Amino acid sequence: MESRGKSASSPKPDTKVPQATAEAKATPAADGKAPLTKPVKKDAQAEKQEQPAAPGPATTKKTPAKADPVLLNNHSNLKPAPTVPAAPSSPDTTSEPKGPGDGAEEDESNTGGRGPWPCENLTPLLVAGGVAVATIALILGVAFLARKK
C-alpha cells in the first residue's frame, strides 16, 4: 500500500514500482522477513537526492535582489533628484563603508537568520529588574532564616 502512495507522488512511477516489487518478491523467499524495509530506504534516498535540487534555485534568487544603499536609507516620499544618474553604477564599486544603516543586516534577518530583538531598549530594564528581584529574594531569605533562629 505504501508503494502505491509513493509511486503516485514520484515523477517516474513506472520505473520505481517494478524494482520494488521484484525486490519484495526476492527477499521473502530468502529471509522470510518483511520485504518493505529495503524499498522504503531506497525511496527515502531518492527523495533526499531530489530535495537538494529545490533549494539551489532559491539561493540564486537572493543574489539579484541587492538594492542601492542610498535608496535603502532614503525614508522620504520625495522622488530622487535628477542629478543622481552618475551614482547608480554598481553598488559593489562604491567605497562607502558598510554600517548598520545600509540594510545588509536587515536583509539577512528576513531570511530566517536571528535578527535584533524588537524591544532592544527594554533589555537593560529587564536586567535591572532581574537583579532587583534577586536582591529582594536574598534579603527575604536571610530575614526568614534569621527569624527562625
Swiss-Prot record:
InterPro entries: Cend1 (IPR020162). Belongs to the CEND1 family. Homodimer. Interacts with AHI1. The chain crosses the membrane at residues 126-146. The keyword Glycoprotein does not apply. Residues 1-12 have a biased composition (Polar residues). Involved in neuronal differentiation. Residues 40-50 have a biased composition (Basic and acidic residues). The keyword Phosphoprotein applies. Residues 1-118 are annotated as: Disordered. This is Cell cycle exit and neuronal differentiation protein 1. Residues 147-149 are extracellular. Residues 20-35, 80-97 have a biased composition (Low complexity). Residues 1-125 are cytoplasmic. Its main location: membrane. The modification Phosphoserine is found at residues 10, 90, 95.
